[in-house]
């Protein structure tokens, strides 16, 4: 049986040594994952309430679709990331658990149901993401904008963060989202440039950097955010270079987390990073000038999103003196 990542060769790392990957059974075995990667089984009143709300309004969350390990903690803290534009993606990234295929027709009522859910859940910080919809002329940007505006009308005091696709670099699409005035604009770089052919074969590293730069150019007041995974075979100098690239393109908030292979059909994992290594990257990121760095084994884009935004705002105000 061949896997979808096996036809995606990448260049060797800068040190020239071939990358060795962990066998899937070792990753998932009883003694495979280190203790710091153990997450609680999702349960609790907050978790059940959010699940019922999402089901009742026919909404999707990336928490479920991408099999996020933090779903129990976040949902019990009344934090969820809404996934708009359906749950079928037009791309086939090597790390992602979201279904790939032909997407459904657009649901034009979805933005209003998301706003209704935000109101019912009493959220102070809503995160909106989506699958890629490359078949749409604007990549779904207009639906992002409609969702932001619907939340503003229903819950005026709620901060809105968007985690967008790259819209194939379409500046008009990026402007459509920024014109709706999100508080935070997030687009993930995901990995180091050398690994793009395997990890993000339909994306371009430079294009993602330009999306972030252009969003900040359009609205200097918006917080920009990006993140990447480690454990895919990158080396230290590539991690540091990627962090510098993001900072040089105006990114305010950085997230770094451990890649965890969703299934045997996804990209293999090279190694586990320790909590001490993540702490070192956080320190380095703050020294580079990021307003906030969330770096840890179980960190994902929206993990502690409200706290990230508040901390970054304080940092930006402090920098202005």
Swiss-Prot record:
It is found in: Cytoplasm. Its EC number is 2.8.1.8. It catalyses: [[Fe-S] cluster scaffold protein carrying a second [4Fe-4S](2+) cluster] + N(6)-octanoyl-L-lysyl-[protein] + 2 oxidized [2Fe-2S]-[ferredoxin] + 2 S-adenosyl-L-methionine + 4 H(+) = [[Fe-S] cluster scaffold protein] + N(6)-[(R)-dihydrolipoyl]-L-lysyl-[protein] + 4 Fe(3+) + 2 hydrogen sulfide + 2 5'-deoxyadenosine + 2 L-methionine + 2 reduced [2Fe-2S]-[ferredoxin]. Residues 75-291 form the Radical SAM core domain. One of its GO terms (molecular function) is metal ion binding. It comes from the Bacteria. Residues 1-21, 301-321 are annotated as: Disordered. SMART domains: Elp3. One of its GO terms (cellular component) is cytoplasm. The keyword Disulfide bond does not apply. It is an enzyme of class 2 (transferase). [4Fe-4S] cluster 2 binds at residues 89, 93, 96. PANTHER family: LIPOYL SYNTHASE, LIPOYL SYNTHASE, MITOCHONDRIAL. Belongs to the radical SAM superfamily. Lipoyl synthase family. This is Lipoyl synthase. It comes from Rubrobacter xylanophilus (strain DSM 9941 / JCM 11954 / NBRC 16129 / PRD-1). The gene is lipA.
């Amino acid at each position: 049986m061949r896997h979808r990542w096996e036809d995606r060769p990448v260049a060797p790392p800068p040190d020239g040594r071939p990358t060795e990957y962990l066998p899937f059974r070792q990753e998932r075995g009883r003694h495979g994952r280190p203790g710091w990667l153990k997450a609680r089984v999702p349960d609790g009143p907050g978790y059940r309430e959010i699940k019922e709300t999402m089901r009742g309004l026919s909404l999707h969350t990336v928490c479920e679709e991408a099999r996020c390990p933090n779903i129990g903690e976040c949902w019990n803290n009344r934090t969820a990331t809404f996934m708009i534009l359906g749950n079928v993606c037009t791309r086939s990234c090597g790390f992602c658990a979201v279904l790939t295929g032909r997407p459904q027709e657009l649901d034009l009522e979805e933005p209003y149901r998301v706003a209704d859910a935000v109101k019912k859940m009493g959220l102070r910080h809503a995160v909106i993401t989506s699958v890629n919809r490359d078949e749409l002329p604007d990549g779904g940007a207009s639906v992002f904008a409609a969702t932001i505006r619907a939340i503003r009308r229903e819950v005026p005091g709620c901060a809105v963060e968007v985690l967008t696709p790259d819209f194939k670099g379409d500046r008009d699409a990026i402007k459509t989202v920024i014109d709706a005035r999100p508080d935070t604009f997030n687009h993930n770089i995901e990995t180091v440039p050398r690994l793009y052919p395997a990890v993000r074969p339909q994306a371009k590293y430079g294009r993602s950097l330009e999306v972030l730069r252009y969003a900040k150019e359009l609205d200097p007041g918006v917080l920009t955010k990006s993140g990447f995974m480690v454990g895919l075979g990158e080396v230290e100098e590539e991690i540091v270079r990627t962090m510098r690239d993001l900072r040089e393109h105006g990114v305010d908030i950085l997230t770094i987390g451990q890649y965890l292979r969703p299934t045997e059909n996804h990209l293999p994992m090279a190694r586990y990073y320790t909590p001490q290594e993540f702490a070192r990257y956080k320190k380095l990121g703050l020294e580079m000038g990021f307003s906030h760095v969330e770096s840890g084994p179980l960190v994902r884009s929206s993990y502690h999103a409200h706290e990230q935004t508040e901390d970054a705002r304080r940092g930006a105000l402090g920098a202005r003196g």
